[in-house]
């Protein structure tokens, strides 16, 4: 599933080619995504100039003169720029055609993504209750410490809660906890302020490094230019259960937390 770095990579790839451009037509070949694509999307967006492309959590916000297209890549989706007129292949559900001669093509084999229209996106029900962005000053270790008091859940699903902080998905939660030396199974409410301060720093560092590398391509993800990400080469623990720890050589273990597999080092993480 594309996580925050992959979505930010997509945003950075498509924004320069969309901003300031006018939409000539929207072609929807299949409306059946997680929620149906609005039947009048072509009418609403065609003829409008795209003002900006922003990201909120794992949602892309394509802001037009009137209204915003809210897009989510789901489990296997991607948005990429192609030349106008390029024939569509299987699973290529939407084309946003631009007067520049390019079009933004949405591909989603599993159809768990979304394309919705809103006149007030930040108050849309999907975005309204989201926590702070992890790479801003609104997120820090003090926030983690305060919100964790009295919480008996494991720390990994705690930091993956979008009400606590957005965009810390399975890959990057696993890596940040390893970097901070915290066992993902530990009770969130039992971790000290000092360790949460360290964890917040590592969350920011890991996410920033992943964005710099263009995200992590494990299976489906490609950026807006059609290229894969390279952060998978930097992974210390995610997907390496049963293999030796890169730092100490201890065999990495796996645990199930919140229906997700979690890999950790029993020696490096306490």
Swiss-Prot record:
Zinc finger (FPG-type): 236-270
Subunit structure: Monomer.
GO terms assigned for molecular function: 8-oxo-7,8-dihydroguanine DNA N-glycosylase activity; class I DNA-(apurinic or apyrimidinic site) endonuclease activity; damaged DNA binding; zinc ion binding
Alphabetized UniProt keyword annotations: DNA damage, DNA repair, DNA-binding, Glycosidase, Hydrolase, Lyase, Metal-binding, Multifunctional enzyme, Zinc, Zinc-finger
Signal peptide: none
HAMAP family per UniProt: Fapy_DNA_glycosyl
BP GO terms, sorted: base-excision repair
Keyword Coiled coil appears in the UniProt entry: no
EC number: 3.2.2.23, 4.2.99.18
Protein name in the entry: Formamidopyrimidine-DNA glycosylase
Segments traversing the membrane: none
InterPro entries named among the record's database cross-references: DNA_glyclase/AP_lyase_DNA-bd, DNA_glyclase_Znf_dom_DNA_BS, Formamido-pyr_DNA_Glyclase, FPG_cat, MutM-like_N-ter, Ribosomal_uS13-like_H2TH, Znf_DNA_glyclase/AP_lyase, Znf_FPG/IleRS
Cofactor note: Binds 1 zinc ion per subunit.
Requisite cofactors: Zn(2+)
Gene: mutM
Active site location: 2-3, 58, 260
PROSITE patterns the record matches: FPG_CAT, ZF_FPG_1, ZF_FPG_2
Naturally occurring in which organism (per UniProt): Pseudomonas putida (strain W619)
